[in-house]
From Swiss-Prot:
The active site is at residue 63. InterPro entries: PsdUridine_synth_cat_dom_sf, PsdUridine_synth_N, tRNA_psdUridine_synth_TruB, tRNA_sdUridine_synth_fam1_C, TruB_C. This is tRNA pseudouridine synthase B. Its EC number is 5.4.99.25. Belongs to the pseudouridine synthase TruB family. Type 1 subfamily. It comes from Psychrobacter arcticus (strain DSM 17307 / VKM B-2377 / 273-4). Responsible for synthesis of pseudouridine from uracil-55 in the psi GC loop of transfer RNAs. It comes from the Bacteria. It is an enzyme of class 5 (isomerase). One of its GO terms (molecular function) is RNA binding.
Length: 380
């Protein structure tokens, strides 16, 4: 069970007279505002003489021109915002063909123009298929990425173009539909780090022309959807108590299903940062979850590392080996297997920590050997 944001409100240690507001709110970002401006506005709206969130942050930037879903974390929820930074995102955009801008969207200056060849939805379907899957994308100059401690858009505004290494992205779903002879509607679900502005330019090139975005709306972030949002105007029109009803629990951003229930004594110990031995509390389901998480981690991070392991030189294959040597080799392999198994049992996996009342108290890292390390805990 998750702790509700209104239940999580506690006295701030720095301001004992103020109740700390914690939770996640899904805002429909208006056009023309930066993401940080929206965060500052929301933080202000949850502040009163008796209330304060202390901290606030979003889970992924939207350009000023863009609208749509912007999850904002307040108070204790900011500790878990990074889980949504890594989540897949869905967008709907409008591409205007025939011209390119320096920013890749309608906020920039037109830098080049081109004629538009005839196209239809059949052609667009074929082009969309070309963009599906894993690929690399070069970030735009007008972005907040940094090079040598300086943001790329600062170089761009100074008329300087710098090399940007391509980044791995995945387009998991994409649809292109003709709006008219000059405009295309793009709907895409993509991995983190994908720039829809760059994708729009690449699609225009595939059609045989140039293009830039004239509209962009984020529809989904992880499991959060646009129809669950509230506009800033509507939020501002509410009283503080009504605003709090739109807050999701502090752990709403966390996409971890496994949980471990701790006794009151164990809760006190983890709140003090102490490690626990919970080997007797690891159910079969929890052990299976940890094992699966370890296997998934190893397959993604070490998929190329294992290729060259245990490869012998051709000359070594021709060496004379007696029975004793063979037995020694088998003994060595057994030792290696034992060591590898021991290491696997020590790999920590993040899980939810729950108290005896079913209240979420934070995250811990637990391994198959039963060691639990407190990781991110909320201040109760």
């Amino acid at each position: 069970m998750s702790i509700a944001s209104t239940q999580a409100d506690k006295k701030s240690s720095n301001h004992p007279d103020k109740i700390k507001i914690s939770g996640v709110i899904l805002v429909d970002k208006p056009q023309g505002m930066t993401s940080q401006q929206v965060v500052s506005k929301v933080k202000y709206l949850f502040k009163s003489p008796n209330h304060d969130s202390k901290k606030a942050g979003h889970t992924g930037t939207l350009d000023p021109m863009a609208t749509g879903l912007l999850p904002i974390c307040l108070g204790e929820a900011t500790k878990f915002s990074h889980y949504q930074l890594d989540a897949d995102k869905s967008y709907q955009a409008t591409i205007l063909l025939g011209s390119q801008t320096d920013t890749g969207d309608a906020d920039g200056q037109v830098t080049a123009e081109a004629t538009i060849s005839a196209f239809d939805d059949t052609m667009l379907d074929k082009i969309a298929q070309q963009f599906l899957g894993a690929q690399q994308q070069i970030p735009p100059m007008y972005s907040a990425l940094k090079k040598d401690g300086k943001k790329l858009y600062e170089y761009a505004r100074a008329g300087i173009e710098v090399d940007r290494p391509p980044r791995d992205i995945i387009l998991k779903a994409i649809e292109l539909k003709a709006i008219d002879e000059q405009q295309i509607q793009l709907t895409v679900t993509c991995s983190k780090g994908t720039y829809v502005r760059v994708l729009a330019e690449d699609i225009a090139k595939a059609i045989g022309t140039l293009g830039h975005l004239t509209a962009l709306s984020r529809l989904q972030v992880g499991d959060f959807k646009i129809d669950e949002t509230i506009t800033l105007a509507n939020l501002e029109a509410l009283a503080l108590e009504q605003r709090q009803t739109y807050l999701l629990p502090v752990d709403a951003c966390i996409d971890i299903n496994a949980e471990l229930t701790l006794s009151s004594e164990q809760c006190e110990r983890v709140q003090m940062g102490q490690r626990l031995n919970v080997i007797d509390q690891l159910t079969n389901d929890l052990q299976s979850y940890i094992t699966s998480a370890i296997e998934q981690h190893l397959s993604t991070s070490n998929k190329n590392a294992a290729v060259n392991q245990n490869v012998e030189d051709d000359n070594d294959d021709n060496d004379d080996n007696d029975d004793n040597d063979d037995n020694d080799d088998n003994d060595d392999n057994d030792d290696n297997d034992d060591n590898a198994q021991q290491l696997l049992h020590e790999i920590p996996v993040d899980i939810r920590l729950i108290d005896e009342h079913g209240t979420f108290i934070g995250l811990g890292a637990v391994s198959l050997n039963g060691r639990l390390q407190p990781k991110k805990l909320i201040q109760l």
